[in-house]
């Protein structure tokens, strides 16, 4: 598939850096320092213009506060999480909710549904972080990308296909905390992308799903397996 100047780098687990043809740097689910799958060369984030957070679990919100304070990106998240981030001193929080779209530079960001929990661990407490979500990103070059966040397959993925028609779907496959490869293949049937990037697998022993298993089930599109630190462009 031709990404038309878009660059997608997998930093391990559910963390991605996406660079648009105009040079906008997007960081999705910023967990790098404690992420055992993230290459050492990527643990120091050098630039980020837009940060997207799908939910409040440590392996997704991870380094959001530190990176946001250092680079001052626009931080897109659900309102309850935004309130928590602002209490931690994060500025430029761009709250939104499911179904909403906001334009950030050369990207149209739409927040969509995910089926997962969203508590934020804050010291010895778990703080309500709103609901988990996914994002649809439509770029100026007409490429559309869907990051599902942590989720199981759900029937409204068909709506995501019908309204936005993402060509690329980043789908969790690890099982236990998210869907497994078989469910991810069913999600692909609903979404009808051109390519799936499998994520959220292998980081911990309990995340047993494998891209090779996904390939056995998927019939509607390619499975674009990436290695942590690899860039698809």
Swiss-Prot record:
Endpoints of the signal sequence: none
InterPro entries, per database record: Metallo-B-lactamas (IPR001279), RibonucZ/Hydroxyglut_hydro (IPR036866), UPF0173 (IPR022877), UPF0173_UPF0282_UlaG_hydrolase (IPR050114)
Disulfide bonds: none
Protein origin, superkingdom: Bacteria
Gene3D superfamilies in the record: Ribonuclease Z/Hydroxyacylglutathione hydrolase-like (3.60.15.10)
Keywords assigned by UniProt, alphabetized: Hydrolase
A Pfam family hit: Lactamase_B_2
SUPFAM superfamilies listed in its UniProt record: Metallo-hydrolase/oxidoreductase (SSF56281)
GO molecular-function terms, A-Z: hydrolase activity
Hydrolase keyword on record: yes
Annotated family: Belongs to the UPF0173 family.
Protein name: UPF0173 metal-dependent hydrolase Acid345_3437
Organism: Koribacter versatilis (strain Ellin345)
The organism's taxonomic lineage, starting at the top: Bacteria, Pseudomonadati, Acidobacteriota, Terriglobia, Terriglobales
